[in-house]
Amino acid sequence: MAESEESSWLVIDGYEDEPAAFGVPPYVGFHIRYICGVLESKNLEYEYCPIDSFRINPPNLENRLGVIILAGAVVPGKYLRGTPISLKETREIISNTPNETPILCGGWAIRGWKNQGWSPLRHNLFLALKDTDATLSNYLETGEWRHNRRTAEQWTAWAQAGAKSKAVTDNPDLSGPLTYEVEVYQGCVRFKRGCKFCIEPKKGIPIWRDPEDIIKEVSIA
């Protein structure tokens, strides 16, 4: 995997697999694209690395502006083209990253591990419990970690910026059979008494994207 001579962010795609989101190859998830979209919109250097590529040829963790790990596989399953990141692998990446480098971990697996008692002690490590992309954006603007949710305007901007991000252009499956998943809304009408196996009700009242924004995102991709 190519290394940048300049300091850059490292985005590790640990994949997501939710009842309403497929992010395990050949799918490229929308949440990882939003994260890359934040970095794209701020013109920051970054490297995109799927966890399967990380296992084969780990990128250098030195000289990084920061490391972002998305771990969102919460549905048990068997996969044909990839394997989501494990808690053990997440721990190893964190321990191998220089102490002065900020680390942001997000995704529903991170929330699940935290609820099960995982509470790593490390300087400048943040476990995002809301939108990872919005949390990252706030950190880049203020230098402070805080749980944030994206606004409708941010959703549009980061979705469209993410459509042409390295999560797509540097994806190992770009030549085929990469499948680009699109998020049209989040949440569930049964947010008070939703299905116990599903996490969508936990996102609250449904929020819909504007159809024109979705069409533009797809046209960019």
Question: What are these model-predicted stretches?
Answer:
Residues 217-221:
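Short Fe-S-cluster ligation motifs
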Residues 2-216:
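Acidic, low-complexity intrinsically disordered segments
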